[in-house]
Amino acid sequence: MSESPKKVIVGMSGGVDSSVSAWLLQQQGYQVEGLFMKNWEEDDGEEYCTAAADLADAQAVCDKLGIELHTVNFAAEYWDNVFELFLEEYKAGRTPNPDILCNKEIKFKAFLEFAAEDLGADYIATGHYVRRADVDGKSRLLRGLDGNKDQSYFLYTLGHEQIAQSLFPVGELEKPQVRKIAEDLGLITAKKKDSTGICFIGERKFREFLGRYLPAQPGKIITVDGDEIGQHQGLMYHTLGQRKGLGIGGTKEGTEDPWYVVDKDVENNILVVAQGHEHPRLMSVGLIAQQLHWVDREPFSGTLRCTVKTRYRQTDIPCTVKALDDERIEVIFDEPVAAVTPGQSAVFYNGEVCLGGGIIEQRLPLPV
């Protein structure tokens, strides 16, 4: 007697990647069902209300593919485990990455548990551009085949056990192929543009959105030489290496080079700026990271040669990683790197394999 097909619950976002993932899994012989997660409660009459449109698109795709679509509300989990932490980080003058937190707490925790326990799933699947491979009996996380779309940076907190229960069908394809499949199938999501903005909160005006939850405190903008040259509307609206939105031009005596944020003095509510994107104050020789997650879940000790990304879409930087203690590591880059930002994630790679990462606690500035 043949075994019954394994059951996969696909996280349907209403986008093209999850739509095509569901179809690919059907082709591979899985019993496929969809799940739409509502993770944010919109205010009534909110103009950015995309959740209803996304749900309608997800439903249309599931109808077309002949699969059931479940819905679940994780808004409370999102608020408690992602959003409150996100606000705390901003309050402390750091720049968090909510997508990483959301993957850790919602998609690969709340969703994974709900799919297994309530829906009887053998696996979950998402439309992430990553791959998995089994090495020495443990599931490893690999970069997506499409280097331009690879999303392993956002999934470094996953352990091998979570990866073993997750399928990533589009990780083996390039984005144009995914769009072509959706077009050939006549899916409503074929030409839908990729979502940007904060995970699940969508493309709302960020400044206005943040201002609802955190009181903005205007303060001085000073240069690295100590001259006051303007006012900022709130430190939380600025991040290291930022050039746009400072509202200052070149100075009378100085060059016309654009200004960049090089530091945030949280205690005194001062934004520090310098001219030129390779200003020494913007460069770091390394970083200290904490809140470490290694995919193989083995504690790290000693030293390691690998590459690191300190933000998404960055070219890999060769580096040496040294364990300081169980909780923290020191990372020294082979060459100085601009705009290393506390609160963001440092993610480590050995070739195609994502090893894990941690949160940047501090950057190690160029010796003056």
UniProtKB/Swiss-Prot annotation:
Cellular component, GO annotation: cytoplasm
Enzyme class of the recorded protein, top EC level: transferase
Region of interest called Interaction with tRNA, as start-end residue ranges on this chain: 149-151, 311-312
Any GO MF annotation of the entry: ATP binding
Subunit relationships: Interacts with TusE.
Stored NCBIfam families: PRK00143.1, trmU
Record's protein name: tRNA-specific 2-thiouridylase MnmA
